[in-house]
Amino acid sequence: MTTADGIVRGRRVGDMLAWRGIPFAAPPVGPLRLRAPQPTEPWTGIRDAGDFGAAAPQHPRGVTLRPGKRQPMSEDCLTLNVLTPAAPSAAPRPVMVFVHGGAFVMGTTALGIYHGNRLARRGDVVYVSVNYRLGPLGFLDFTEFSTPERTFDSNLGLRDQVAALRWVQRNIAAFGGDPDNVTLFGESAGATSVTTLMATPAARGLFARAIAESSAPVLVNDGHRARRWAREFMPLLGCDDPAEAARALDAAAPVELGRAGNRLGARVLAETPGLHPFGPVVDGEFLPEDPLTSFRAGRAHPVPMIIGTNAREGTLFPRMLDALPTDAARIDTMFGLTDPEAQARVVGAYAGYPDPAAAIDLGGDITFWKPSVEIAEAHSMHAPTYNYRFDYAPRLMHWAGLGATHAFEMFAVFGYGDSAAGRALTAPGGRRGLRAVTDRVQENWISFARGGVPAPWWPRYDVDHRRTLIFDVPTRVERDPGRDRRIAWTGYAGYRDEGSAAESLP
């Protein structure tokens, strides 16, 4: 296959054609570390594109793909993957570009659930998945440490995603895709990227519609907070002199940056539960304003959007990366500037609070559900918007106290219930239900990607009716699910409000 940068050779995977590890930007190493992505150098000859590219540097133990198999890590990580049905198509295929999650500190497109075969096959679409920089190398803002000799840029991981979308515009037609029919979709940090890119001027025109699965806009940091965290990071790296910061950032090995980042993340979670030092930054340039502000003002890109969350987002986090305020002590700290009466209204909406289950649901709601509803409210006034809640969970997940937890909808989106992991989850019961929900989810995602509207039985969202699709057995439409909680959150003022009451749409 011939791209703008050279010829790539992929491989056949059953009835699909796959090209993996294609560079979409120059390796961000040496003088390009902590700089905006630069164009890749064209190559001569044929470049092998049979294997996934390296994962971005992240946890020192690496990325486990399956028992005994780890994905290599490297700063040279700016690659993407293209998957398309092998059968010829009379017309260009719709394109679905996926941004993986992982709290902006972990993840890789090499994970099996992200391969996309089942989704691309059923939808007859071109599927693209994107690696981007993570952690300190991708989502801390070191710009104030720039010197005349050494410049640092902001929002590096977000800029990587824009560079990948530009690559798609230049090259996807060669793979049979339609550059004018691109759906950008992501989960968790990937969904946060999607909603942030909708407020990013550089991303305008690079995608025609968007799907945000469990977006967490709280991960977007204002410039003041981002600069403070960058300053706190440097002593953790062993550099106490700001004048030496540029040299220290250049000299540090990725593992040293990662360890300092882990320590910073733990400190921030302890001091300000619910916030996270790694994420997009409102820098006034690449990201001019907070995405929620853009949506409320009608300045977000007016593309059709599907947005939603899972019924019990918070239950996963105490068992792994416990980055949410999921216990009463951290929730009290999180409320920060909130009036005590407003706080009482919120906690009163969670039956049993401060019991752990209620606290976990509250933490999940403030991180994912509440801001996603606010985005749906605002965007519905300017563009077609479809809101969902994913409620289905097999028996084993209910037994484990997880329910429809964070990220589980991806088993339906990617048809992963037929994988070994999916079969294990549904062994005690629920395989038929997961297949039914998978059919409904994929039907809607594919219809939306192909023509900009989901299935006809999914009504548009608006603030008058708040009709929301509930993915469950059976799948159904409900009006204003979670109404009592939504109203209770009115008046919440957290850290990012800096002393003013939070805006709330009716």
Each model region followed by its residue ranges:
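Polar, surface-exposed loop/tail segments
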Residues: 392-393, 451-476
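Non-catalytic accessory segments of hydrolases
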Residues: 1-155, 274, 422-456, 473-475, ...
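Sec/Tat-exported extracytoplasmic proteins
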Residues: 169-172, 201, 214, 237, ...
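Short, solvent-exposed loop/turn elements at domain surfaces
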Residues: 27-33, 314-317, 396-397, 478-479
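Serine-hydrolase-like catalytic core of hydrolytic proteins
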Residues: 63-246, 263, 285, 293-320
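Non-transmembrane alpha-helical segments in soluble domains
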Residues: 96, 162-165, 169, 195-198, ...
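Surface-exposed patches in mature extracellular/periplasmic domains of secreted proteins
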Residues: 180-182, 240-248, 387-389, 455-460
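Substrate-gating cap/lid region and adjacent catalytic-acid/histidine neighborhood
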Residues: 209, 218, 255-432, 444, ...
